[in-house]
Amino acid sequence: GEKLQPNIMQLLKKGSEAVREASKDSGKDIKIAVHYTNIENNSEVYDRAEDLKNAKVDYDVFGLSFYTFWDGTYENMQRVAKTLRENYGTDVMIAETSYAYTSEDGDGQGNSFVGTDDIVEGYPATVQSQATVVRDVCAAANEVGAIGVFYWGGTWIPVGKATDDNSAIWEKFGSGWASSYCADYDPDDGGLYYGGCAWDN
């Protein structure tokens, strides 16, 4: 993948141009969203917004990942969203969020959410807490004018222990893990690990 910001901006500009053209050809108002993670590091997010502005990338929505167990407080998420709206004139959405309903392993592979280390105070790893976190994220985002929230990985549930049989099926039909088809883009991980699901809770 491309790692230099000027080159990334050029790719985003070309992608944006293609979407605008498709939007015009189809007669549909297709919104363009960019999506960034690690919002606990405010300056990094603002740097990306500056890069987009300086490169004149045409987009409508700035998407943010927000996980309560990785990305800081609700207040920080709100501060970032508000700053982006006010300083860059863009709509903002929470492009991905989720929370675990259990800390148990379901397929013999490691999980992204690992037991007590990732549990947020007030939200034990239960079905009710998962629902409460989603509701609280939606409420916090709405308070600062975000246009929407997307739940991430709703299909990432375990299907049993990772076996060679499962790996062959996932390789053929696809899965949520890094199959060999991504080796050109991600040679360090493509098809090499996570024969199950990295997020099965």
Regions found by a protein language model. Name each.
Residues 49-106:
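Flexible, glycine-rich surface segments
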Residues 1-51, 57, 72-79, 166-170:
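Active-site cleft segment of glycoside hydrolase catalytic domains centered on the general acid/base Glu
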Residues 35-40, 64-69, 97-100, 152-156:
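Active-site beta-loop-alpha junctions enriched in small/polar residues
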Residues 15-23, 52, 84, 134-141:
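Hydrophobic, Leu/Ile/Phe/Ala-enriched alpha-helical segments that form helix-helix packing faces
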Residues 2-6, 38, 65-71, 119-129:
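The substrate-binding groove and active-site-proximal loops of carbohydrate-active enzymes
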Residues 26-31, 57-60, 88-91, 145-147:
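Short, well-ordered coil/turn segments that N-cap beta-strands
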Residues 79, 83-86, 102-115, 119, ...:
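Aromatic-rich peripheral "rim/lid" segments of glycoside hydrolase catalytic domains that contact
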Residues 62, 130, 149:
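Conserved, mostly hydrophobic/aromatic
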